[in-house]
Amino acid sequence: MVDIILFRCLGQLHFTQGRNHILLNGRPLHLRGTVENAVFPKTGHAPVCDAEWERIMRIVKDYGLNHIRFHSWCPPAAAFRMADRHGVYLEVEMPMWGKDAEPDEARYDFFRREMRAILKEYGNHPSFVLYCNGNEITGNFDFIEELTADGRKLDTRHLYSGSTARTRVPSDQYYVSQQTNKGPVKVYEGRPSTDWDRSKESDVDVPVISHESGQRCVYPDFREIGKYTGPVEARNFELWREMLTANGMGDQAHDFFRASGALTVVEYKAVIEALLRSSKSAGFQLLSLNDFPGQGYAPVGVLDPFWDLSLIHISEPTRPEPIS
């Protein structure tokens, strides 16, 4: 006789909506997150094995973050399992972006079925805290409200939002945005200081999470070209290297990378500290901890697209003391 032991992940977590914060078991939770843009150059698709997602979750925690927003996509089961294991809170979305909510009944039916499938398949994971329909949506917001309200009725274990960074809907339980009706909550500019924050702008009727904070670009590191060994090639890097060489500055490429990278780290520090000072901020989502080689090219991370340590660092990150 063979004994078969089945393991199922269970979590004794209770997430609720507070005035300014998401509450975890009744206590305010400040989300410190990064945006995951489905960037996997080695394979061209998201990993489905536990090992790779465990690596990503460990990196996220090593940098003092506790949250990942999956930008207009839902990750595979392995991501949820490893987030459960390492205590990373997830925002999950459908593949809805921009004009996807324009009138189209066939598309609407797909989104209704997709939302139900996500909640049914992954709803039991304690790491699945936030659900949002998608990114910067425009179009028919009556449909967005329908989806959001239906989600709240179907599964009360999560908090729901209609869209990031655009129109609010009545069923929103949190709001990811760069701006509220009281002003900007994302820090793009400001004189160097230690006292400015975004408390006033974040003080609305639902918790506000700063949308895609950061976006400070670093000069490309052409040494990354050799890492693109899969279906994705760094043709853009090759063109930029040729242009720099043609203009007589090819030997300065690494200096440009180091200088812009050092400035980016300083700017990210200022942005994060301002949001941490904002007592009424529910959190932030960086764009992003790793570079985003899509939608053009956005080298906005302190890690490269492979989640590897970028050479702009002086030293390895030090794991901070555990905080919620």
Listing of model-derived features with the role each one plays in the protein:
Residues 10-17, 213, 289, 317:
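Hydrophobic pocket-lining residues within nucleotide cofactor-binding pockets
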Residues 57-59, 67-291, 296-303:
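Substrate-binding/catalytic cleft of secreted carbohydrate-active enzymes
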Residues 1, 80-83, 314:
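Hydrophobic alpha-helical segments that mediate membrane insertion or helix-helix packing
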Residues 312-313, 317-324:
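Single conserved hydrophobic/aromatic residue that forms the stacking wall/gate
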Residues 63:
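Active-site charged/polar residues at nucleotide-handling catalytic sites that mediate phosphoryl
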